[in-house]
A protein has these predicted regions:
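Blade-edge beta-strand/turn elements of extracellular beta-propeller
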Residues: 1, 34-50, 95-97
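Acidic, glycine-rich loop-and-beta core segments that form the ion-binding/anion-interacting portion
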Residues: 1-36
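Terminal intrinsically disordered, low-complexity extensions flanking WD-repeat/beta-propeller proteins
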Residues: 43-46, 54-55, 65-66, 75-78, ...
Length: 158
């Protein structure tokens, strides 16, 4: 399926035919297992590019089947929404909806909180002389995934 060194993989718990892989080539590949060719090989349905180093972790968001996040050696966590990609386009830049840049070192792991909407814990190897890493708790702004009209109505109150 993927030519480069694959570092991580995650099945979509809601759309179980979707699989995401992250690799050394800085890309997140989305695969649709219903689209295997006769020899059992697959071509990614989307290639998400927004990191400058290898992908170290990824996970689908438990509350929405089109959303996933990827962490990488570039110290970033990107949140993607593949429903924003035009069906007739190879341009996947619209899928990047949020980027967490709070870490100073390689992102080694993260977990979505299954009960707190858009909340995540992330771990980074800060590469300090004392060793060890950091854990951050953070939340993607709810307005990233709210319809524009609802956001405007809410902001007009202020």
């Amino acid at each position: 399926m993927q030519c480069q060194d694959v570092h991580c993989v995650d099945w979509n718990a809601i759309d179980t035919h979707l699989l995401a892989t992250g690799s050394a080539d800085h890309a997140v590949n989305i695969w649709d297992m219903r689209k295997l060719d006769k020899s059992g090989k697959a071509t990614p349905v989307y290639v998400l590019e927004g990191h400058t180093n290898g992908i170290t972790s990824l996970q689908w968001y438990p509350g929405q089947s089109s959303v996933l996040a990827s962490g990488a050696s570039d110290s970033l966590i990107n949140v993607w929404d593949i429903s924003r990609i035009q069906s007739d386009s190879n341009d996947t830049t619209a899928a990047l909806v949020f980027q967490h840049s709070g870490h100073r070192g390689e992102v080694t792991d993260f977990q979505w909180n299954a009960t707190e909407k858009w909340t995540m814990l992330s771990v980074s190897d800060e590469s300090q002389p004392s060793g060890g890493g950091t854990v951050q708790a953070w939340r993607v702004n709810d307005m990233v995934y709210t319809d524009e009209e609802k956001v405007l109505q809410e902001l007009q109150q202020y």
